[in-house]
Amino acid sequence: MATKFQEGGQLEAQRSRLGPPKMYKVVLLNDDYTPMDFVITVLQRFFSLDTEQATRIMLKVHNEGRGVCGVFPRDIAATKVEQVSAFARQHQHPLACIMEEN
């Protein structure tokens, strides 16, 4: 957005410079109850991953306790966390999804 300043009777336009937005990781956390197939479905549905990518992340969640689904600006990451959490609750799974600053 341009801001106008008056110096000595002249108006000059000065542009604000914005840096890139902070990015946030969306992370799935392992639990002992959510089926692996459901985790793959979540990854495909909400993160547009193919079966191979979704399976790789699901196995990382299963084996290491957590897996990064993607990195997004804050508002998109928060939306994805809410969508995944609501979908898991709707299907009665305790799958946890969080966001962390990248």
From Swiss-Prot:
Record Gene3D superfamilies: 3.30.1390.10
Superkingdom field: Bacteria
Disulfide cysteine pairs (residue numbers): none
GO biological process: protein catabolic process; proteolysis
Family listed: Belongs to the ClpS family.
Oligomeric form and interacting partners: Binds to the N-terminal domain of the chaperone ClpA.
Function: Involved in the modulation of the specificity of the ClpAP-mediated ATP-dependent protein degradation.
Name of the protein described by the UniProt record: ATP-dependent Clp protease adapter protein ClpS
Organism: Dechloromonas aromatica (strain RCB)
Underlying gene: clpS
